[in-house]
Amino acid sequence: MQERHTEQDYRALLIADTPIIDVRAPIEFEQGAMPAAINLPLMNNDERAAVGICYKQQGSDAALALGHKLVAGEIRQQRIDAWRAACLQNPHGILCCARGGQRSHIVQRWLHDAGIDYPLVEGGYKALRQTAIQATIELAQKPIVLIGGCTGSGKTLLVQQQPNGVDLEGLARHRGSAFGRTLQPQLSQASFENMLAAEMLKTDAHQDLRLWVLEDESRMIGSNHLPECLRERMTQATIAVVEDPFEIRLERLNEEYFLRMHHDFTHAYGDEQGWQEYCEYLHHGLSAIKRRLGLQRYNELAARLDAALTTQLTTGSTDGHLAWLVPLLEEYYDPMYRYQLEKKAEKVVFRGEWAEVAEWVKAQ
């Protein structure tokens, strides 16, 4: 039964998106997991907790005996069947537990008895996690070009189209503003960092990478924060600023935040509940900056938002949203971004419209 246990092996697993059957308890998996991992636990949360208490009170032999007692009979067979199905579906995958200890070895042995030989990660999730952290530290040392610009400048799309671009907002499942949440919940901090490391490793492995192209982000992207090693390098990076006409930005924002989000919510929840979720999403975003807008201005814009939603519901038109979006950009988002950009003006090396910045980036 083959085992993977070298640094290069760990990196190769992440680069190849190797399917990982993670047999840790769900609570451990939620706290941090690798990108291509699926959670098929040997023990559920309650079983793991009981075994842990037994280990502290009576030692390892008693804990092991309790574990075998809890995962026996029909429960054991159901879990073997689930692992077996996952192995057959992912013939080039690998088993993983916390440290490559008893849990993954037990599952490996039970699978062997069921006719399947399947490798495991020697060192487990902990070893993969350390590999991810170290890879990010190393890869962050390459030069970085940041793509800046006001809200609606198409920065994310520009980054996505570069072979050396890494979409930080996509990995974080958040677009970085008060209206930035998506229908996908954000991952734990550790899982986000693991996703980032894997993406950087894959991007670096598939080309002769000289520099990174990233969006000019703040430290926080929703509830996730950038690893300090990368954030520190980004503060030293050069910046290319997209300066598109205001009307073009409005078109992008209409497409992204009104048309697409409405479509996504109704696709996920159905027409009626999807509409309610969409309305709540927009109101929540505006409410998040109530204090900065001031109560009077917030109430004015919230009333315009309600009117725009009524128009959209009855006619399908999103044009009414301009009545609150335009002042929100002119009075809040644009001044805020310009103020932030002024503080790092010496790092700006290029300005232009979207296509011009894209061409400039390709030439670097």
Swiss-Prot record:
Alphabetical UniProt keywords: Selenium, Transferase
Protein name: tRNA 2-selenouridine synthase
Function of the molecule: Involved in the post-transcriptional modification of the uridine at the wobble position (U34) of tRNA(Lys), tRNA(Glu) and tRNA(Gln). Catalyzes the conversion of 2-thiouridine (S2U-RNA) to 2-selenouridine (Se2U-RNA). Acts in a two-step process involving geranylation of 2-thiouridine (S2U) to S-geranyl-2-thiouridine (geS2U) and subsequent selenation of the latter derivative to 2-selenouridine (Se2U) in the tRNA chain.
EC number annotated for this UniProt entry: 2.9.1.3
UniProt organism field: Escherichia coli O81 (strain ED1a)
One Gene Ontology MF term: tRNA 2-selenouridine synthase activity
Subunit structure: Monomer.
NCBIfam families named in the record: PRK11784.1-1, PRK11784.1-3, tRNA_sel_U_synt
Annotated family: Belongs to the SelU family.
Residues at the active site: 97 (s-selanylcysteine intermediate)
InterPro entries, alphabetized: Rhodanese-like_dom, Rhodanese-like_dom_sf, SelU
CDD domains assigned to the protein according to its UniProt record, in alphabetical order: RHOD_YbbB (cd01520)
Domain Rhodanese: 14-137
Keyword match Lipoprotein: no
